[in-house]
From Swiss-Prot:
Keywords: ATP-binding, Cytoplasm, DNA damage, DNA recombination, DNA repair, DNA-binding, Hydrolase, Nucleotide-binding
Protein known as: Holliday junction branch migration complex subunit RuvB 1
Membership in a protein family: Belongs to the RuvB family.
Enzyme class (EC, first level): hydrolase
Region feature Large ATPase domain (RuvB-L), mapped onto this chain: 13-222
Comp. bias regions, Polar residues: 1-12
Region (Head domain (RuvB-H)): 296-378
The keyword Mitochondrion appears for this protein: no
């Protein structure tokens, strides 16, 4: 019996006839989906958790202390203990690794840690550290207790990563001088510093690098009530009149992600200013987000397209990732890292050994109803 991987195949496990039979088990209730994004607009950009090029978050919106940091309660407790212990011993923090979907605040919490420790904060990204010279430039200028933050740390070049091993473990920088038989290694002592890494793909990190972090912590999606607090805080800092119901409407469509919540808030603010009196109520927020094609569950047209294609062309699945990408025209990595995490989180999609499967909850949300029993979930 052949097992078809959800990643390794671009073809669905079932033939056209079987797919047609399964698709006939479904009919759409009442309405058709309109993929407005295919007509030129791209409202889906609002819901992408990655920071947009040129998108700058006002520094005033960033929390500066753990007390100001909303959400991630368990993580904050762990970090507060680590900070208190390090302060008592008058030592730098152990190295930390944060992982989780984009937009959850990994960079922000790293900056908060540096501020809590009274340390200088240096920030870079792994793709910017192309050669050993790049990382060495940071390491040699770090003072005791300084924090070096590397985003997308899973993308470090191997030669750069290997240079970090002795730096993290023994606080020394090994430099090779010369070439061939005349080459020799010189070690330079480094000040005790704290390295904080952030990644959306912890499985892509090598074991030697991952094992050198004293703390490995996951950031989870935010609860709606936490996002309401974040939206109200943003409204207060930006001096925008917002009632709790309006904040709740924005929060529940924000895919559990603070970055998206703040982005949606700014678009609703624009709408309220132009179409209303500037006040954000529940009605104003709902009207604005409907205009931007963000539905009450936080799905955009691409989310609905992915789910609808699975239902109407493949009877709900299972479907391999490469097949989904080919049919929808989306990049496989984009589907896996941008769209799938939230669909999995809210229970609209399942991963199985044979591929992706749409759940009954997603079918109800999209307005489908079953005409016959489904073998694919049995």
């Amino acid at each position: 019996m052949a097992i078809i991987s959800s990643r390794d195949t671009g073809q669905n496990a079932e033939g056209p006839k079987r797919r047609q039979q399964k698709s006939s088990a479904w009919r759409k209730e009442g309405r058709e989906l309109s993929f407005a994004g295919e007509r030129g607009a791209d409202p889906s950009a609002l819901l992408q958790p990655q920071a947009h090029p040129g998108e700058a978050q006002e520094e005033s919106l960033r929390p500066r202390t753990l007390a100001e940091y909303i959400g991630q309660t368990e993580l904050k407790e762990v970090l507060s203990i680590a900070i208190a212990a390090a302060r008592a011993r008058q030592e730098p923090l152990d190295h930390l690794l944060f992982y989780g979907p984009p937009g959850l605040g990994k960079t922000t919490v790293a900056a908060v840690l540096a501020a809590e420790m009274g340390s200088q904060f240096y920030m870079t990204t792994a793709p910017a550290l192309e050669s050993p010279r790049d990382i060495a430039g940071y390491l040699v200028r770090l003072k005791r207790g300084d924090v070096l933050f590397i985003d997308e740390i899973h993308r470090l070049p191997k030669v750069t990563e290997e240079l970090l091993y002795p730096a993290m473990e023994d606080f020394r920088l090994d430099i090779t001088i010369g070439k061939g038989r005349s080459a020799r290694i010189t070690s330079l002592p480094l000040e005790r510093f704290t390295l904080i890494g952030a990644t959306t793909r912890i499985g892509a990190l090598t074991s030697p690098l991952r094992d050198r972090f004293g703390h490995v912590q996951r950031l989870r999606f935010y609860e709606p009530h936490e996002l309401v607090q974040i939206v109200l805080r943003t409204a207060r800092l930006l001096n925008v009149s917002t009632d709790p119901e309006g904040a709740a409407e924005i929060a529940r469509r924000s895919r559990g992600t603070p970055r998206i919540a703040n982005r949606l808030f700014k678009r609703v603010r624009d709408y309220a200013q132009v179409r209303g009196d500037g006040h954000i109520s529940q009605e104003v927020a709902a009207a604005a987000l409907e205009l931007f094609q963000v539905d009450p569950m936080g799905l955009d047209w691409i989310d609905r397209k992915l789910l609808t294609v699975l239902v109407e062309q493949f009877g709900g699945g299972p479907v391999g990732l490469e097949t989904m990408a080919a049919v929808t025209g989306e990049d496989p990595q984009t589907i896996e890292e941008v769209y799938e995490p939230y669909l999995l989180q809210i229970g609209y999609l399942q991963r199985t050994p044979r591929g992706r499967v749409v759940t009954p909850a997603a079918l109800r949300h999209l307005g489908y109803e079953a005409q016959s029993p489904l073998p694919l979930w049995s």
